[in-house]
């Protein structure tokens, strides 16, 4: 019987989904297809090998660390520039990552990234917490048909046609979008657009991406070849695009397990499915927005250091909070109830990471033994390195 594990962050992202994906793949001990189901390369899922190697996965599934094949499904946003950078990093670590890309994937280009960063800069103190990868701007560009060429569409263009497409985005779409927003580019941005180097590099990056991956049209045919499917969602339930309570401090994609469940439901036969909800033993949030349990890091552990979520111009410094068991449980139960409308027999599990930083317990008033009640199983992790 085919098996599937859906990896879901239970809060604001950065819960440990990279470790969870590798752990799930190792447990299955079979050939895995690791599906990137939402968002884009703004995700940052960290994996640490027992031999000391370390990588933050953006454009590849985290389970590719142990040989799984990655799959960018139809709602994932592909970025040729960031793909090329990451593939080179993985090859330096001794990996030869393989990847399938849906012909329906949207493709993010440097002008989308530029727009997102200009807009976020103009918000000043009211910034939303963009990662600077152009995810929202790519989604918005694809609402307008002249600019909405999918991965499959772009593969049918020759080099001259692809270059012309990029030139039109740079000379027509980009200034038009800024004009509608009442914004302008500073001299540095203008120089980057007018130099022509961005277009030349975009063509090279696109050709590299196109030659490095395998495109698929039919999800059922692709998935039939794999006994294990690991769906790796980006971000977390509290950042879901439909979470109106925290608007606009959200990610522009659906972060729930329903997206993966629908893909599983399309497949013939039965798929034994588990949702693995991931949480740290405390909470974090990178970027602005509501954070009810926020506290100084020192209240949790003054000595802990997050090597992945370093301060940056887009999201500033990582924020810390006590473990809010009531809020985490509410998000999980709501997500699970919706997914069981699609897959009634789905099992629910929880993985708690970073326990080494909180003395093996949850940071706050919630008792660990109380929180894990009601789940089909619980995985406790007190070290960042995946098990051998």
Tell where the protein language model's regions lie, with residue ranges:
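Non-transmembrane, aqueous-exposed alpha-helical and coiled segments at domain scale
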Residues: 1-388
């Amino acid at each position: 019987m085919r098996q599937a594990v859906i990896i879901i962050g239970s809060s604001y992202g950065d819960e440990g989904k990279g470790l969870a994906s590798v752990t799930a793949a190792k447990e299955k001990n079979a050939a895995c297809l690791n599906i990137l189901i939402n968002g884009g390369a703004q995700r940052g899922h960290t994996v640490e090998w027992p031999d000391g190697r370390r990588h933050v996965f953006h454009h590849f599934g985290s389970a590719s660390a142990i040989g799984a094949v990655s799959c960018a499904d139809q709602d994932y946003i592909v970025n040729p520039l960031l793909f090329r950078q990451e593939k080179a990093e993985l090859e330096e670590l001794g990996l030869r990552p393989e990847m399938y890309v849906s012909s329906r994937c949207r493709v993010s280009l440097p002008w989308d990234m530029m727009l997102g960063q200009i807009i976020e800069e103009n918000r000043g103190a009211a910034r939303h917490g963009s990662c600077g990868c152009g995810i929202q701007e790519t989604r918005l560009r694809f609402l307008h048909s002249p600019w909405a060429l999918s991965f499959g569409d772009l593969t049918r263009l020759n080099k001259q046609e692809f270059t012309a497409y990029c030139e039109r985005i740079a000379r027509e779409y980009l200034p038009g979008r800024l004009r509608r927003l009442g914004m302008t580019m500073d001299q540095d941005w203008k120089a980057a657009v007018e130099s022509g180097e961005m277009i030349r590099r975009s063509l090279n990056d696109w050709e590299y991406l196109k030659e490095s991956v395998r495109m698929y049209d039919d999800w059922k045919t692709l998935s039939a070849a794999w006994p294990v499917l690991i769906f790796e969602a980006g971000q977390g339930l509290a950042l879901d695009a439909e979470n109106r309570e925290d608007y606009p401090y959200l990610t522009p994609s659906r972060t729930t397990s329903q997206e993966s469940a629908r893909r599983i439901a399309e497949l013939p036969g039965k798929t034994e499915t588990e949702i693995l909800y991931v949480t740290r033993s405390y909470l974090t949030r990178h970027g602005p927005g509501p954070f009810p349990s926020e506290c100084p890091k020192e209240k949790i552990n003054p000595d802990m250091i997050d090597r992945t979520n370093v301060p940056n111009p887009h999201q500033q410094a990582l924020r810390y909070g006590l473990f809010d068991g009531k809020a985490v449980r509410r998000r999980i139960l709501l997500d699970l109830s919706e997914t069981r409308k699609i897959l009634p027999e789905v099992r629910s599990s929880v993985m708690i990471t970073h326990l080494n930083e909180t003395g093996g317990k949850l940071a706050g008033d919630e008792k660990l033994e109380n929180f894990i009640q009601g789940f089909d199983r619980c995985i406790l992790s007190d070290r960042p390195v995946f098990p051998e």
